[in-house]
């Protein structure tokens, strides 16, 4: 059992480890857990036994899919590590982990520098204002180059990297690390990296070490006037002053300290842990988060364990032993096991049965989780990702939720046997609850079950999990593009549903104004009824009728998005009006409005990055143009070229195979969803004809 750390917010670090798909992030996390004493044998990813990757698919594919939270201890500090996936299809996982962590380690492959997915992760960290340090990993690999990492961080990320360490030896002779802040060097006495030896800086590295120490002092002087004065007078600042200044610059998002090592060869990981303690923020170092009261007033929430409870649910997982786990971060107050909480997002009361602190695959039960801490709750039934929990009697605030990107790819799925039918719908519902970017719907015309997700890999993994975890066999159709429909001009319509045939009639009558909204706005409903021309209790029914009818647009039956509907007039009948009648009136009105509003089809546009040797560049660009791509730019990367483009998803199916044959297997690409846009006229006609 590791030492218990007395609760002290200053000594808490909530960090994520983020990276491009093969930069060695899971290995780095593994090593951190090994050195902090929570794992007794190191698991290698390429042997398929890493601790953080605890779903079977991850072990097979060697990629990390679900963000697990793991607690470990280092130098009297508690470190909660939120593991984040590096594959593009799982960006929601990265988004939601960024939302609840305070700092991050971004891992780069030293032989590759900054890769496309690292840029995505970096942009997400910028968006959530997460301070970060960088780890140049794989320093023992052929082609490893610290300066490539530094240069690409400046050029591609616009970062201000600060060299904190220099390597001793390079590639396969990489044998130690120079700490330029403390002017000390370290080498390793054994392969496990547990025997670190401090040595004097080798003669041949002294000049370089002094040069970078000097540069580091200059950077530190930007954040501390004392250092500035000492620097100008030729005095040497103390180690504590330098650490404090670099810490301040990092937390203020002005600089990114860069550390190096080889996680696989156990070098540099303990020094990286020291850096987490030295330079990444505690919950007290970051600005308080904002919440909204029911009256719409914005309030600040401070990390005070004695304050009112406020927590955010950031992940749901189905656990084979305890059922549903809700991962939360407590922002204020203290959550105790056995207590009741109020979910302000849903307006429901829930009971906290047990609280767990997680290791990657085992767990300890705890009595309470205090402000700043992360853990899992057993017993919550209604709470989903992005919901806010407050104390039963605490002020009702709602914390800003987590943005969920729209799924862009649809696949029809059907059970192989009658027996699988019932199990399939239950299993899909469970998976959709766990992963907000995965949706399940029924095709309005064909009645088929459609699953939608962020990419082909995402859906493959879902189907895989159906088979393994839920023992459901299913046949899957070909992936289809998730088109959307919208209008291009504002319209005014009315919907009247009146039936008077003996007995009780039906009467619902609404007038709505429908306007197009900018891309990505979704749906906005405004109730502008005054003087009770439609009674209050029927308004939700009108909205429901509209939303249901929007599930299937007039052109090709895809959902209608990006519109604002204002309900401004109508009438009702004392006896014959009902919720049903108003629901139908709403749905009739919106159908007519979309027909009249010059409807268009929208398609998902992907941001695509193709890396190809120079000699195939012409072919690759020609091919992207033929796929209706819009080339955004090119840049050399090593001896290859990187082409960036926007390309419609519809044109990207099977691209991997085509690219391989065009570049004789040397080209590679990544793509992620960027935005929806109108399809060209001739494409729209073709889609409508193909119905």
Swiss-Prot record:
HAMAP family: EF_G_EF_2_B. GTP binds at residues 19-26, 83-87, 137-140. This is Elongation factor G. The gene is fusA. Its main location: cytoplasm. The keyword GTP-binding applies. GO terms for molecular function: GDP binding; GTP binding; GTPase activity; magnesium ion binding; ribosome binding; translation elongation factor activity. Belongs to the TRAFAC class translation factor GTPase superfamily. Classic translation factor GTPase family. EF-G/EF-2 subfamily. NCBIfam families: EF-G, PRK12740.1-3, PRK12740.1-5, PRK13351.1-1, small_GTP. One of its GO terms (biological process) is translational elongation. It comes from Thermus thermophilus. Coiled coil: none annotated. The lineage of its organism: Bacteria, Thermotogati, Deinococcota, Deinococci, Thermales.
């Amino acid at each position: 059992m590791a030492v218990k750390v007395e609760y002290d917010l200053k000594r808490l670090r909530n960090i994520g480890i983020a990276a491009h798909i093969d930069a060695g992030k899971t290995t780095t996390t593994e090593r951190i857990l090994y050195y902090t004493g929570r794992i007794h044998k190191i698991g290698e990813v390429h042997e398929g036994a890493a601790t953080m990757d605890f779903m079977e698919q991850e072990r097979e594919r060697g990629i990390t899919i679900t963000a697990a939270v793991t607690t470990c201890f280092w130098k009297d500090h508690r470190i909660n590590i939120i593991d984040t996936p590096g594959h593009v299809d799982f960006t929601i996982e990265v988004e939601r982990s960024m939302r609840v962590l305070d700092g991050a380690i971004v891992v780069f492959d030293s032989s590759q520098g900054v890769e496309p997915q690292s840029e995505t992760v970096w942009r997400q960290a910028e968006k959530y204002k997460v301070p970060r340090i960088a780890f140049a990993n794989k320093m023992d690999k052929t082609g490893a180059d610290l300066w490539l990492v530094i240069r690409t961080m400046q050029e591609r990320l616009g970062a201000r990297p600060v060299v904190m360490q220099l390597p001793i030896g390079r590639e396969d002779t990489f044998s130690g690390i120079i700490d330029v802040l403390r002017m000390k060097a370290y080498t390793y006495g054994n392969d496990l990296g547990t025997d670190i030896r401090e040595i004097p800086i080798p003669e041949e590295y002294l000049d370089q070490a002094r040069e970078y120490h000097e540069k580091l002092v200059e950077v530190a002087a930007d954040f501390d006037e004392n250092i500035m004065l000492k620097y100008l007078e030729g005095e040497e600042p103390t180690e504590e002053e330098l650490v404090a200044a670099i810490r301040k610059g990092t937390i203020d998002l002005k600089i990114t300290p860069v550390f190096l090592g080889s996680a696989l060869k156990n070098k540099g990981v303990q020094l990286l842990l020291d850096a987490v303690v030295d330079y990444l923020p505690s919950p007290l170092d970051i600005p308080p988060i904002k919440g909204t009261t029911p009256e719409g007033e914005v309030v600040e929430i401070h990390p005070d364990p004695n304050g009112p409870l406020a927590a955010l649910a950031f992940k749901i997982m189905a656990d084979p032993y305890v059922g549903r786990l809700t991962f939360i971060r407590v922002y204020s107050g203290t959550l105790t096991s056995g207590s009741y909480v109020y979910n302000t997002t849903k307006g429901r009361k829930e009971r906290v049965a047990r609280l767990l602190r997680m290791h990657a695959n085992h767990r300890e039960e705890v009595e309470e989780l205090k402000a700043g801490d992360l853990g899992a709750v057993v017993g919550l039934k209604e709470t989903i990702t992005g919901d806010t929990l407050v104390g039963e009697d605490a002020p009702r605030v709602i914390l800003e939720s987590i943005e969920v990107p729209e799924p862009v790819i649809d696949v029809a799925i059907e059970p192989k046997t009658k027996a699988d039918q019932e199990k399939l719908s239950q299993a899909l519902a469970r998976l959709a609850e766990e992963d907000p970017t995965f949706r399940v719907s029924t095709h309005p015309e064909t009645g088929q079950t459609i699953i939608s997700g962020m990419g082909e890999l995402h859906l493959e993994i879902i189907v895989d999990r159906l088979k393994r975890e839920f023992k459901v066999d299913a046949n899957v159709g070909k992936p289809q593009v998730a088109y959307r429909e919208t209008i291009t001009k504002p319209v005014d319509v009315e919907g009247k549903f009146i039936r008077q045939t003996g007995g009780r009639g039906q009467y619902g009558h609404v007038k709505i104004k429908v306007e197009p909204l900018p891309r990505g706005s979704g749906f906005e409903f405004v109730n502008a009824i005054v003087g009770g021309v439609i009674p209050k209790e029927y308004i939700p029914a009108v909205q429901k009728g509209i939303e249901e009818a929007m599930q299937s647009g007039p052109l090709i039956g895809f959902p209608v998005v990006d519109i604002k509907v204002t309900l401004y007039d109508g009438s009702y009948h004392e006896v014959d009006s009902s919720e049903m009648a108003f629901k139908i009136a709403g749905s009739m009105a919106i159908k007519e409005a979309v027909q009249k509003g010059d409807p268009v089809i929208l398609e998902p546009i992907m941001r695509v990055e193709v890396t190809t040797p120079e000699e195939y560049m012409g072919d690759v660009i020609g091919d992207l143009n033929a796929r209706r791509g819009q080339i955004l730019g090119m840049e050399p990367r090593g001896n290859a070229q990187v082409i960036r483009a926007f390309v419609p998803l519809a044109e990207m199916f099977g691209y991997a195979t085509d690219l391989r044959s065009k570049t004789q297997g040397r080209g590679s690409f990544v793509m992620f969803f960027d935005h929806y846009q109108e399809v060209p006229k001739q494409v729209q006609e073709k889609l409508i004809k193909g119905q």
